[in-house]
Amino acid sequence: MRRNGMLLPIASLPSPYGIGGFSKEAYEFIDLLEETGQKLWQILPLGPTIYGDSPYQSFSTFAGNPYFIDLDTLAEKGWLTKEACEASDYGDNESYIDYGRIYNSRFVLLKQAFLNSDILSDEKFTEFCKANQHWLPDYALYMALKNQNDGKSWIEWEEEIRLRKPEAVEYYKKELEEECNFYEFLQYEFHEQWTKVKEYAHEKGIQIVGDVPIYVAFDSADTWANPELFQLDEKNLPLGVAGCPPDAFSATGQLWGNPLYNWAYHKKTGYDWWLKRIAYCFDLYDIVRIDHFRGFDEYYSIPYGDETAVNGHWEKGPGMDLFNTVKEKLGELDIIAEDLGFLTESVFQLLKDSGYPGMKVLQFAFDPSEDSDYLTYKYQRNCVVYTGTHDNDTTAGWFEKLSDGDKEVALRYMNSFYTPKEEQHWDLIALAMRSTADTCIIPVQDFLGLGSEARINMPSTLGDNWKWRMTKGAFSEELKEKIRRMTKLYGR
C-alpha cells in the first residue's frame, strides 16, 4: 500500500510553553495530516534527554520526556493554575527551543502539579506502576539519586549505590520515596497524555512512526540498573564504546561513547531485554524505525578512554538470531531499518533476510562521480523514501549549498532547469512522492520551503541542534490544498 507522511518531532510543535508537547497543537497537527491526505506522522525518540538535548541520548530507553507533558491538561485537573503556567519564563523566540530556560522552569511546575495531585491513591496509577515494574522503579530511583548527587553521572556516585549493593538500594528507596513517586507520576502522566494523542491519530487514520536508537546512553538508568547487559568491567566502566570508523568525511571517525551490548548475555537470556524494549515501543508507536541497523550485523568497538575512533575495530552482532526471536515471540512487526551510510554485503543480506524496508534519502542521490543507489529508478517497492531526515539540511538549504556538479546532476534528474529557485524543493518532494517506494515521508520544513535556519541537527556538533520549532499557522489553506493534491496525484 502506497502511503505518505510527514516528519515532525514532538518538541518542534508550536506551544505557548517553550517546547512542543501533547497539547492541543498536537491534535491540530493530526488534523492537518488528515486534511492533506497523509497517513503517517514520524517523530523522533520520546525519551528524557540529557546534556546536548539529543533525543538519541536519553536517561532511559523506556521513559518519556517530561517536557512533553501538557501543562494545560494539568491545569484542567486542578493541579496547576493557568497563571502559574503562563508566568514561567520559556524564552522569547517561538521558532526555537531555549532548553536552559525550559529546564529551569518546567520541573518546578511539574513538581507543583504532583504535590497538588492525589495520584498515589489513583488505581490507574497503581496499575501503571505494576505493569512497568521491569523498568519504572529503577528509573525513578536513578533520577532521584541523580538529583541528590547534583546531576553527576552514576559512575561518580558512592560505591555502594553505584554498584547497587542491596542494602544501599533499599536505604535510598525509603530515603527518596517522595522523589521516586514524583518521577513515577511524571511517567504515568506522560503515558496517559501520549496514549490520548495516539488514539486521536488513529481516529483520523494516522499511524505514528516512532524511532528507536540502537544504543543507550552510558549515563542512564538502563546501564546503572542492568550492567550485565553491557560490555563493562568489574567497576562497571565500559570495555569499549560505540562509534564509526574514519572515512572520507572524518579522518578520525565518530566517537559516540555509548556502552556496547554484551550480546552473549542477551543470547543466553533469549534476548529478554530486547523483547521487552521492542514490545514497549509498539505500545507507544504503530511503526518503529530502528536506528543504525547495521550495528546488528557488525558494530564498531572503540577502546574506552580514547579521544577518537581511530583505534576501533569491528565485532559481530547478533544478526538474524535476534530478529528471528523477535518474530517468534512478538509476531510480524512494522519495522523500518535505518540502513544509511557505508554498508557491507552482510548488512544487505541481513536487511533482505529480515524483510524490513530500508531507507532512501534523495539528498544523497546526486553525486556526478557515481551511479547512486539513492536514485529513484533503483528503488524496490519495499523501502521508505525521504527528501532528507533530521540529520540532513532542509531541502531548500541543501540546494543552496550544493556544488555546481552535484546541482547539475540533481536538476537534470528532476528536469528542473527552468523551475524557479524558490520552488525547487517541490521538485524533490514530487520526485520522492512519485517514486515506486511504498512509503514516502517528507520533513515538515520541506513542505514549508524553509532554509538551513530550520535544520534540526548537524551530526557531530553541539550547540544549536534540536531547537527548531514550527510556528503556529505555518500551513496556509493554499499550501494544505497543494499537498493534498500532490498526495492524491501520486496515489498515496
Predicted stretch roles:
Residues 29-44, 197-200, 204-206, 274-291:
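Conserved catalytic-core segments centered on acid/base and nucleophilic motifs
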Residues 24-31, 127-128, 192-200, 274-276, ...:
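Short alpha-helical segments and helix-capping/turn motifs at coil-helix boundaries
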Residues 1-79:
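Trp/Phe/Arg-rich N-terminal binding region typifying the photolyase-homology
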Residues 183, 187-216:
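Conserved, well-ordered alpha-helix/loop/beta-strand core segments that scaffold catalytic motifs
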Residues 9, 15, 53-187, 216-441, ...:
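Alpha-amylase-like alpha-glycosidases and glucanotransferases acting on alpha-linked glucans and related
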Residues 35, 161, 468, 479, ...:
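Domain-scale activation on soluble regions of proteins
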